[in-house]
Amino acid sequence: MENFKGLQKSLYIWTDSADLDKRVEQLKAATGGDVALENVHRLSFSSYANSSFDLIVIECAQLTDSYVKLLHMLKPSGKLHLVSYIGPAASLLQEIKLSGFINCREDSPDALTAEKPGYETGSSARLSFAKKNASAVNVWKISGDDEELIDEEELLDEEDKQKPDPAGLRVCSTTGKRKACKNCSCGLAEELETEKQSQKATENAKSSCGNCYLGDAFRCSTCPYLGMPAFKPGEKVQLADNLLKSDI
């Protein structure tokens, strides 16, 4: 028991009273502290406070449900020492580990030692990863005014802002102009003729309510502009040929 030197308060759990005083004196000499006595059969009725002892020694006893209680009775980093135990060492070591002890080991063929963790049961500790990183916090303090943003208008030239003329989108592949050649075979002649006929048909199309340009919500049920987007007053809008023909 030289490893227990300096432990101030110990509990000796006994089963046989023969030479009990001698064993207690040996434990006092090894630890240099006070030793309390408790009978193994009275252990379940005892009312020791938690974290009361630095060392608990059990001699010639087999415990099944009391290791957890002994764990609470020990101070953090306190030691449990079993001498002349009953049963296989491997089974006892596993039972002690499952009760919450650590560093369980077999010191000799008839002695086992275990330790209580260095913290009290139910205690808490602050985790390091919960600390806020100062640099990460400062990121949210960056002002948007410090960022140099590109003006979207500077990305466009004056030519980009001009709308293309629909009349000049398609030209003849031969003349390079929007005018069909004599023997047109690209379809431009038919397209120009269709536009011409449509223009003639829609020249006399007038609004009877004056709200056609506002959109479908303001148009009557027979409005020829139904389905078309809103347009500016006086803006020329080309209607399809089938909208000017009677359904009957």
UniProtKB/Swiss-Prot annotation:
Query: Where is this protein localized, as stated in its record?
Result: Cytoplasm; Mitochondrion intermembrane space
Report what the protein is called: Anamorsin homolog
Entry-linked Pfam families: Anamorsin_N (PF20922), CIAPIN1 (PF05093)
Gene Ontology molecular-function annotations: 2 iron, 2 sulfur cluster binding; 4 iron, 4 sulfur cluster binding; electron transfer activity; metal ion binding
Q: How does it assemble?
A: Monomer.
Keyword Transport assigned: no
Which stretches of sequence are listed as region Fe-S binding site A? 172-186
Q: Where does [4Fe-4S] cluster bind?
A: 209, 212, 220, 223
Q: Could you give a single Gene Ontology term from the biological process aspect?
A: negative regulation of apoptotic process
What residue intervals hold the motif Cx2C motif 2?
Answer: 220-223
Q: Which GO terms describe its cellular component?
A: cytoplasm; cytosol; mitochondrial intermembrane space
Tell whether Plastid is among the UniProt keywords: no
Q: What does this protein do?
A: Component of the cytosolic iron-sulfur (Fe-S) protein assembly (CIA) machinery. Required for the maturation of extramitochondrial Fe-S proteins. Part of an electron transfer chain functioning in an early step of cytosolic Fe-S biogenesis, facilitating the de novo assembly of a [4Fe-4S] cluster on the cytosolic Fe-S scaffold complex. Electrons are transferred from NADPH via a FAD- and FMN-containing diflavin oxidoreductase.
Motif Cx2C motif 1: residue span? Answer: 209-212
Residue positions binding [2Fe-2S] cluster: 172, 181, 184, 186
* Keywords associated with the record: 2Fe-2S, 4Fe-4S, Cytoplasm, Iron, Iron-sulfur, Metal-binding, Mitochondrion
Annotated region N-terminal SAM-like domain: where? 4-129
| Essential cofactor(s) | [2Fe-2S] cluster; [4Fe-4S] cluster
InterPro entries from the xrefs?
Anamorsin, Anamorsin_N_metazoan, CIAPIN1, SAM-dependent_MTases_sf
Annotated region described as Linker, given as residue ranges: 130-161
Q: Which organism is it from?
A: Drosophila melanogaster (Fruit fly)
Where do the record's region annotations for Fe-S binding site B lie? 209-223
Identify its protein family.
Answer: Belongs to the anamorsin family.
Domain topic, free-text comment: The C-terminal domain binds 2 Fe-S clusters but is otherwise mostly in an intrinsically disordered conformation. The N-terminal domain has structural similarity with S-adenosyl-L-methionine-dependent methyltransferases, but does not bind S-adenosyl-L-methionine. It is required for correct assembly of the 2 Fe-S clusters.
